[in-house]
């Protein structure tokens, strides 16, 4: 009897030990990832990134625990892009203009007036041309682009309204430090001034710059309308954001996990894009109600100036890629 009881106790202890080891293995297998961006918590780029993080955790049965860090919490846009390479950040959503620093070709998406509208940009994101760029970018950097989100048509805000390219002459305007972003203001004789995204509001408020350019949804979220009197509907760049996964994460994922990360981030991008397009359609009237002057532009004057003063080839892009983008449907 005593012998039988001892055997039962040993069996129970063994089962408990195996259970504890199994639990420990599960904990060890869980991966905590950092997903960074520079946008506000109210914006779809954040809310849908949080949705994607939760969805990935759910679909992986808790293997991947992703924390989303918004509003430049982990650094400026340059910092978080560098973090992918350094291994300090695991995922980001950011503009292709930063990817362009390592792979020039992808920056053609910022050439002024290259996209007709948001639908055209999203058609390009599904095109063979963009998939070719994704592969070449990955081959060069190890970073994997999994999704493309519509960011919005970039409009110009300023203290003083203008109606055409000539009216921009001499204005000190904040733009990201990327040649294609500088192309329109430079073509019109303005003075483009690079300032970190998180510092733009203060720069407008204290007069360091006279103007800035961003989509209407960003102008709302960052409250730039509080320190600017007019919004000019230039729509000079139809902008997007790319979701990127660092090499030290992507290379360790199984094929099934890579597929899952791609599917979920693409779903999040589609959700955010739809929200941005809807909100853009509402904001002109809302800004008018806030007392902001809305100015319809002579966009052809901007296009002509860009084509004359900043031709495609001068920025390092090719006519072949431009023509393929124009054909995207």
Specify the residue positions occupied by each region the protein language model found.
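Bacterial N-terminal signal peptides
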Residues: 11-22
């Amino acid at each position: 009897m005593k012998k039988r009881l001892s055997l039962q106790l040993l069996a129970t202890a063994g089962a408990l030990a195996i259970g504890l080891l199994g639990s420990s293995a599960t904990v060890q297998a869980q991966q905590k990832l950092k997903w960074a961006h520079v946008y506000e918590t109210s914006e779809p780029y954040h809310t849908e990134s949080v949705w994607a993080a939760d969805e990935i955790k759910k679909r992986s049965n808790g293997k991947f625990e992703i924390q989303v860090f918004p509003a430049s919490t982990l650094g400026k846009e340059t910092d978080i892009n560098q973090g992918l390479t350094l291994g300090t950040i695991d995922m980001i959503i950011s503009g292709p203009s930063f990817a362009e620093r390592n792979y020039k070709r992808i920056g053609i998406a910022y050439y002024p007036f290259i996209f007709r509208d948001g639908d055209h940009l999203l058609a390009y994101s599904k095109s063979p041309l963009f998939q070719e760029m994704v592969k070449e970018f990955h081959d060069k950097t190890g970073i994997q682009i999994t999704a493309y989100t519509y960011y919005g048509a970039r409009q110009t805000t300023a203290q003083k309204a203008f109606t055409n390219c000539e009216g921009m002459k001499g204005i000190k305007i904040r733009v990201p430090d990327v040649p294609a972003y500088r192309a329109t203001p430079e073509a019109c004789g303005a003075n483009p001034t690079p300032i970190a995204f998180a510092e733009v509001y203060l720069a407008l408020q204290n007069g360091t710059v006279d103007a800035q350019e961003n989509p209407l949804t960003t102008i709302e979220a960052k409250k730039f309308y509080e320190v600017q009197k007019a919004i000019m509907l230039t729509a000079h760049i139809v902008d997007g954001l790319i979701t990127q996964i660092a090499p030290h994460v992507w290379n360790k994922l199984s094929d099934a996990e890579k597929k899952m990360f791609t599917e979920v981030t693409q779903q999040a991008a589609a959700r955010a894009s739809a929200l941005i397009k809807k909100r853009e359609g509402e904001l002109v009237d809302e800004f008018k109600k806030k007392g902001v002057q809305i100015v319809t532009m002579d966009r052809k004057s901007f296009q002509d100036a860009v084509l004359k003063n900043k031709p495609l080839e001068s920025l390092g892009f090719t006519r072949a890629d431009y023509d393929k983008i124009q054909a995207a449907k």
